[in-house]
């Protein structure tokens, strides 16, 4: 039986922390579906298409990873993608508290959906999309935190 997992997020932008989780999940499972969330109420730096493109570039070396956009319920994406495992990253206890609430809700909506939590290596434990965006907006260098293609896209966006 093929094990397909979903790794959802906004990925605005995708960071080395996200890429680490994707790579590790790709080593553990047959196929990783990266679900890029779109919510009209959430203001993002990049459009859904731009975020998906950055993820495709950042994961091009992984042949068992696909990138899809979605809006609506994550459990609907899991059903559509025939995945019954959700992969989430945990950096802090605040992440854990937030994710625990979501996991409980997902179980109510889709009892067969299991959640696997992966913790980042020390060098990515502090990293978030918000930190990367804010650093770039204020003129800081972000190259060490994101894929080169992503860094270029961020620098271009900040110039606008």
Curated annotation (Swiss-Prot):
Name listed for the protein in its UniProt record: Phosphopantetheine adenylyltransferase
Residues bound to substrate: 10, 42, 74, 88
A GO molecular-function annotation: ATP binding
GO cellular component, one term: cytoplasm
Annotated function: Reversibly transfers an adenylyl group from ATP to 4'-phosphopantetheine, yielding dephospho-CoA (dPCoA) and pyrophosphate.
Short name of any one Pfam family annotated for the protein: CTP_transf_like
Pathway: Cofactor biosynthesis; coenzyme A biosynthesis; CoA from (R)-pantothenate: step 4/5
This enzyme's EC code(s): 2.7.7.3
Organism: Aliivibrio fischeri (strain MJ11) (Vibrio fischeri)
Subunit structure: Homohexamer.
Compartment annotation: Cytoplasm
Keywords, sorted A to Z: ATP-binding, Coenzyme A biosynthesis, Cytoplasm, Magnesium, Nucleotide-binding, Nucleotidyltransferase, Transferase
GO biological-process terms attached to the record: coenzyme A biosynthetic process
Species lineage: Bacteria, Pseudomonadati, Pseudomonadota, Gammaproteobacteria, Vibrionales
EC class of the enzyme, as a word: transferase
Binding site for ATP: 10-11, 18, 89-91, 99, 124-130
Site feature (Transition state stabilizer) residues: 18
Reaction catalyzed: (R)-4'-phosphopantetheine + ATP + H(+) = 3'-dephospho-CoA + diphosphate
Record family assignment: Belongs to the bacterial CoaD family.
Cofactor(s) this protein cannot do without: Mg(2+)
């Amino acid at each position: 039986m093929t094990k397909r997992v979903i790794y959802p997020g906004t990925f605005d932008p995708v960071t080395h922390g996200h890429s680490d989780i994707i790579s590790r999940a790709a080593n553990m499972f047959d196929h990783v579906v990266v679900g890029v969330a779109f919510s009209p109420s959430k203001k993002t730096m990049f459009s859904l298409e731009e975020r998906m493109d950055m993820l495709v570039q950042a994961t091009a070396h992984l042949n068992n990873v696909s990138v899809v956009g979605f809006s609506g319920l994550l459990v609907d994406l899991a059903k559509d993608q025939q995945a019954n495992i959700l992969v989430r990253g945990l950096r802090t206890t605040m992440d854990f508290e937030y994710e625990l609430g979501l996991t409980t809700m997902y179980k109510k909506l889709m009892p067969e959906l299991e959640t696997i939590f992966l913790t980042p290596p020390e060098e990515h434990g502090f990293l978030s999309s918000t930190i990367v965006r804010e650093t770039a907006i204020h003129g800081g260098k972000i190259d060490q935190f994101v894929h080169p293609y992503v860094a270029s896209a961020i620098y271009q966006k900040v110039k606008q």
